[in-house]
A protein has these predicted regions:
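Alpha-helical multi-pass membrane segments and their bilayer interfacial helix-loop junctions
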Residues: 1-172
Length: 172
């Protein structure tokens, strides 16, 4: 990965942003394709397969984040790309039965809601953390509600622990 990063950095002028985005999306599609192929064969995805799927979701997030930073697709409402990513990752998590991708969906949702942790927040807590507690509690409440909805729908997927852990971490 470090070698790819150096290659892109040294040759970015020749590669260009659209080629980089296309390469990230193609790599993400390849990762998703392996999970879809496994699911269509009615096989159980291995732990390595789960992490390949997570890699695909992270590559998709990187492509969307880079496109937003480079081209300002959403303008002043730039944070909406996090909400779109949360929805896409949640759809992928439920479709492909992945707790890892669900955790990425919940993280993107928390980012959209404005819950963030930066090292700078430790040095200027009065300004940087203003309102963070309420946003974190709202996020925890949303995760509890999502877990309750999941339980109500009696989904066969074992996602309740993910919702509970995220809710507990954001509430504390």
């Amino acid at each position: 990965v470090a070698g790819v990063g150096l290659l892109v950095r040294r040759n970015f002028d020749r590669i260009g942003p659209l080629t980089l985005i296309a390469a990230l999306l193609a790599a993400a599609a390849g990762c998703y394709a392996t999970a879809i192929r496994t699911q269509r064969r009615d096989a159980v995805r291995s732990i390595a397969g789960d992490y390949v799927l997570l890699l695909g979701a992270l590559l998709l997030s990187a492509a969307v984040g880079y496109a937003e930073a480079r081209f300002q697709l959403f303008g002043a409402g730039w944070s909406r790309h996090l909400l779109w990513l949360a929805a896409l990752h949640a759809l992928a998590a439920y479709t492909l039965d992945s707790r890892l991708v669900l955790s990425l969906a919940l993280t993107a949702f928390a980012g959209w809601l404005g819950v963030e942790a930066r090292l700078g927040n430790l040095w200027a807590p009065g300004q940087a953390l203003l309102g963070l507690g309420w946003r974190a509690l709202a996020c925890a409440a949303a995760f509890v509600a999502a877990g309750a909805l999941h339980r109500q729908l009696r989904s066969r997927r074992d996602f309740l622990d993910v919702f509970d852990h995220f809710a507990a971490n954001f509430a504390c």
